[in-house]
Structures are given as structure tokens and as C-alpha cells.
Amino acid sequence: MSNWRSKKLTQSAKHEACVSCGADDGTVVWAHSNEQRHGKGMGIKAHDLFGAYLCHKCHAAYDQGKVLHRLAWFMEQWEKSMIIACEKGYL
């Protein structure tokens, strides 16, 4: 079974600010979870549902393990992103 994908959701990032630091500098992307439980595998991104609006700096910090309590931090960003995505009709 393949992971769930949504071009509408992933492309919505270009219209959003970073949910972690608030940056609205053109570097915000839909940053996918790095958790296997969210569908992440070798060379496979997690389901699009498990992502967050993150700028380049915050995305890099997450990917490189530079945030404390990595899963808890990501889930906090995910929750904020899901509220935005639902309110704006991206989901």
C-alpha cells in the first residue's frame, strides 16, 4: 500500500508562514515527519498527512535532530499545521 499524497496540501505551504518561528520568507515547505509510524521509510517520505509548515531553518533543525524531544516538537508543529490546513480547506 502506498502512502497518502495530496498535491493541494503540499503546495499550500507556499502561502503559509512557518508554524514554529513565524518566518514568512519564501522558504516554507510542507515538511514531512521522519517517523516510521507516519509511513517514513528508506527513500520514502511519510504520508502527506504527517507534515508541518516549516521554513528552511526549522526544517533543517528538525531533519538534523537539533530540536529537543524531536517527536513531541514535530507533533506540536503538526497540530498547528493541521488547524491551518483544515480552516483554509487544504484538506
Show the residue positions of the predicted features.
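A generic structural signal for well-ordered alpha-helical surface patches
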Residues: 31, 53-56
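Short, intrinsically disordered, charge-biased short linear motifs at domain edges
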Residues: 2-11, 39-46
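Polybasic, low-complexity binding patches
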Residues: 39-49, 60-91
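Short cysteine-rich loop/turn motifs with clustered Cys
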Residues: 4-31
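Short recognition patches in nucleic-acid-associated and regulatory proteins
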Residues: 26-42
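The −1 position to Zn-ligating cysteines in a subset of zinc-ribbon hairpins
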Residues: 17, 51-54
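Short Cys/His-rich local motifs and their 1-3 flanking residues in nucleic-acid-associated proteins
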Residues: 23, 57-60
